[in-house]
């Protein structure tokens, strides 16, 4: 995908059949291939040095770590530019350059080796940035700052480096959980499939907030579409269905998943369903991440405490979810997870047990099967395939 193209509902529907062939649904066996991913980590415990490079054998699920791609402080979440030539990372710090803020970094990617070369690093305009994404045109990087409850946008320069922040928004409010919701805590920020709105999840104020987005300038403006979740729910991460009609929200504090019908023209959300993120799982469970699978037919969510990946079937008409499977992640505290570009494997980062495991993905049923393969990485938090 180039910097000037975007993924639309028409693209998704018209290429679904081709995508299924690429996922191996046709029954043909693809030749063994090796793909690589970048691993974001926490370095504050002294065990990790920054961003690591992982290679995956897409025939067996075997993995290997190829050293440190870039030394960086607490690069906890990563995003890839649509052109595949630049990687962005938030540095989840509360102090940077002598000021009460974290940072966001840009790295040029060497085409052949995947080596990272620092381009620049800027203040994130808030403490402890925990999420970074890139809009569909590749012109704007978006950051959510957890501790400060701010979101910010940064223009992307010609070489992929970041320009000074274009828009900064301070969230306000609090929730009923005195320990976790004493103030705003922005946890996720993405653009919608048409690139017309920015959607942000704020764990501290129990809100999913919608902003009008100017893709040419990176400016955001309030449209008044704040959707309040159940008090104490703590919305954490967001995922759109590729067809653009549904938004999925995973709530960290009450361990639920919420399905919203999405009107892209108005940036409006209508709640459709609330269901358990870990059906029948541990009493103390803190969901972390969620993704729609490669075929668009299944939703996956990670559960910390329960230490599982939950799999749900998606009703194509209503977007509603039906629980199908829960599989152990083989480690402790699964944070981010990712599908490899072929769609054959899902990799999950177990933060507290310093491990990444791979799972085979059945493209027909959506079910996961452990590959038996595991690799050790200190405090892995994010997996981003190139």
Predicted regions mapped to residue ranges:
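Beta-rich, blade/repeat-based domains predominating
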Residues: 72-83, 125-136, 172-195, 229-246, ...
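Asp-box/WD-like beta-propeller blade repeats and closely related beta-sheet repeat scaffolds
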Residues: 115-187
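C-terminal segment of N-terminal export signals and the immediately downstream linker at the start
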Residues: 24-42
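Short loop/turn segments immediately following beta-strands, especially the blade-tip
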Residues: 55-60, 108-114, 155-162, 212-219, ...
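Short glycine/acidic-enriched loop and turn motifs that connect beta-strands
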Residues: 43-46, 93-97, 148-149, 205-206, ...
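N-terminal secretory signal peptides and thylakoid transit peptides that target proteins
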Residues: 2-20
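A short beta-strand motif characteristic of beta-propeller blades
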Residues: 64-69, 118-122, 175-179, 223-228, ...
């Amino acid at each position: 995908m180039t910097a000037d193209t975007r993924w639309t509902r028409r693209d998704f529907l018209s290429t679904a059949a081709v995508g299924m062939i690429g996922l191996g649904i046709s029954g043909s066996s693809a030749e063994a291939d090796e793909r690589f991913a970048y691993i974001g980590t926490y370095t504050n415990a002294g065990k990790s040095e920054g961003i690591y490079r992982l290679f995956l054998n897409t025939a067996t699920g075997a993995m290997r770590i190829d050293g440190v791609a870039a030394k960086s402080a607490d690069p906890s979440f990563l995003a890839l530019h649509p052109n595949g030539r630049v990687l962005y990372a938030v540095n989840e710090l509360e102090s940077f350059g002598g000021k009460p803020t974290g940072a966001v970094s840009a790295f040029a990617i060497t085409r052949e080796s995947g080596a990272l070369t620092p381009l620049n690093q800027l203040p994130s305009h808030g403490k402890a940035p925990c999420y970074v994404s890139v809009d569909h045109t590749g012109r704007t990087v978006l950051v959510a700052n957890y501790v400060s409850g701010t979101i910010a946008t940064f223009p992307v320069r010609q070489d992929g480096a970041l320009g000074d922040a274009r828009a900064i928004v301070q969230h306000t409010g609090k929730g009923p959980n005195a320990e976790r919701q004493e103030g705003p805590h922005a946890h996720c920020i993405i653009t919608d499939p048409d690139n017309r709105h920015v959607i942000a999840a704020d764990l501290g104020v129990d809100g999913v907030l919608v902003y009008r987005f100017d893709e040419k300038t990176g400016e955001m403006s309030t449209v008044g579409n704040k959707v309040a979740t159940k008090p104490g729910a703590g919305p954490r991460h967001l995922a759109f269905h590729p067809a653009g009609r549904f938004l999925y929200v995973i709530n960290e504090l009450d361990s639920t998943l919420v399905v919203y019908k999405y009107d892209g023209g108005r940036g409006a959300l209508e709640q459709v369903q609330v269901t358990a993120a870990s059906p029948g799982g541990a009493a103390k469970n803190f969901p972390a991440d969620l993704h729609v699978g490669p075929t668009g037919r299944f939703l996956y969510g990670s559960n910390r405490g329960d230490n599982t990946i939950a799999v749900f079937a998606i009703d194509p008409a209503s977007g509603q979810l039906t629980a199908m499977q829960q599989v152990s992640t083989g480690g402790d505290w699964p944070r981010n997870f990712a599908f490899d570009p072929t769609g054959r494997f899902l990799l999950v980062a177990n933060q507290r047990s310093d491990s990444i495991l791979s799972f085979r993905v059945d493209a027909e049923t959506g079910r996961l099967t452990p590959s038996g393969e595991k690799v050790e990485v200190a405090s892995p938090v994010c997996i981003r395939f190139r």
